[in-house]
A protein has these predicted regions:
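A short, surface-exposed alpha-helical micro-motif characterized by mixed small hydrophobic
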Residues: 102-103
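Conserved hydrophobic alpha-helix in the ABC-type ATPase nucleotide-binding domain
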Residues: 77-78, 82
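Loop/turn-to-beta-strand initiation segments
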Residues: 58-59, 89-93
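A short helix-turn-beta junction within AAA+ P-loop NTPase domains corresponding to the substrate/partner-engaging
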Residues: 107-129
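H-loop/switch region of ABC-family ATPase nucleotide-binding domains
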Residues: 95-97
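Walker B catalytic acidic pair
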Residues: 64-66
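Phosphate-coordinating catalytic segments in nucleotide- and nucleic-acid-processing enzymes
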Residues: 1-57, 125-168
């Protein structure tokens, strides 16, 4: 929870009856004026504080698009927190469409710390219309998918623009 407080620059305080505030060293704010990404961090902190998430004891943590509404600067610390929870026995299942979250997972995964991240890419077969699942242990082995294609298109466009159309 200290890591979460460090990310947010303060602590979420739960008074009961639904009243939640965010407290820094000098001020206290209604959680309603906090950015959504910080509120997500506060919720994670609260789940840990109450024991709803107990690494190695509680069931899996399912989190759909944890990066949604998150300040991009907070993505790396979020991944570090998730990996630390995992190292302590918490199974975490994420769904994302975000290249940067995937890349931070790839860069911060440490096999020496026995990190185990498995990537699953879902796609629709264009002929049979069946859903395919490709599962790999290495980010670089993920088959081409909408995330990698969109990021590749963006990169190609930026390179083309910066080179003034050379090579066309």
């Amino acid at each position: 929870m200290d890591e979460i407080e460090k990310i947010c620059g303060g602590k979420f305080v739960f008074y009961g009856a639904g009243k939640v505030t965010f407290k820094t060293n000098n001020e206290e704010y209604s959680v309603n004026v906090m950015a959504e990404g910080f509120r997500k961090a506060g919720l994670l902190s609260r789940l840990l504080e109450t024991g709803a998430i107990r690494p190695g004891i509680s069931g899996p943590l399912f989190w759909d698009e944890p990066e949604a509404n998150l300040n991009p600067k907070l993505m790396q610390p979020l991944v570090e927190i998730l990996l630390e929870l995992s190292r302590n026995g918490q199974q975490i299942i994420l769904a994302t469409h975000n290249y940067f979250l995937l890349k931070w997972l790839d860069l911060l995964t440490n096999k020496g710390k026995e990190d185990h991240v498995r990537y699953h890419a879902l796609s629709c077969d264009p002929v049979t219309k069946e859903i395919r699942v490709d599962s790999v242990d290495n980010y670089h082995q993920i088959s081409s998918n909408a995330i990698s294609e969109a990021f590749g298109d963006l990169t190609d466009f930026e390179i083309d623009r910066s080179m003034g159309g050379l090579g066309r």
